[in-house]
Amino acid sequence: MRTLKSLVIVSAALLPFSATAFAADAIQEQPPVPAPVEVAPQYSWAGGYTGLYLGYGWNKAKTSTVGSIKPDDWKAGAFAGWNFQQDQIVYGVEGNAGYSWAKKSKDGLEVKQGFEGSLRARVGYDLNPVMPYLTAGIAGSQIKLNNGLDDESKFRVGWTAGAGLEAKLTDNILGRVEYRYTQYGNKLDTQDIRVGIGYKF
């Protein structure tokens, strides 16, 4: 009887320690709360932009008197456009206007290119922070022929197509490199490489 009474007293004395240990185990078993992760905002190509370009053109002019002439030289100008974006697809419209210093003479006939411009559609794929793109549209250029006696200047209209790579340099500054092929009817073909820098609004 005394033994049973002793067991009851010992059990009662150990009960608070058992409850404390159980509570500690319950607290330790709770999983840690993960720290919040900050997600960087996704860059968007959508919106308006404008910029300047510098390039070099390799041209081929066709004449009825001396055959083909290849006037090559530098060109420069400005561009502006507007982009829309849906997921990773970027599309929009862009125009450019500039001047080409291409000029060459052959057998007394001089061919000279002057003002040039285009209005094009663009479609690209967002590979943040760069975007490869394709472009195509209508183009026009001033072409002047001079044989020493007559000076003929005409504005030729044709088509243009090309591809490029645009890169985000900062949140508002863009850089690009572009190849374009342009055909002004059957009188002049041009191929040029352009580099540009732009500002995104």
Curated annotation (Swiss-Prot):
Residues 1-23 form the signal peptide. Belongs to the Omp25/RopB family. It comes from Brucella ovis (strain ATCC 25840 / 63/290 / NCTC 10512). The gene is omp25. Keywords: Cell outer membrane, Membrane, Signal, Transmembrane, Transmembrane beta strand. GO terms for cellular component: cell outer membrane. Has a C-terminal deletion compared to that of other Brucella species. GO terms for biological process: symbiont-mediated perturbation of host transcription. Its main location: membrane. It comes from the Bacteria. InterPro entries: OMP-like, OMP/PagP_b-brl, OMP_b-brl. It is found in: Cell outer membrane. Pfam families: OMP_b-brl. This is 25 kDa outer-membrane immunogenic protein. The keyword rRNA-binding does not apply.
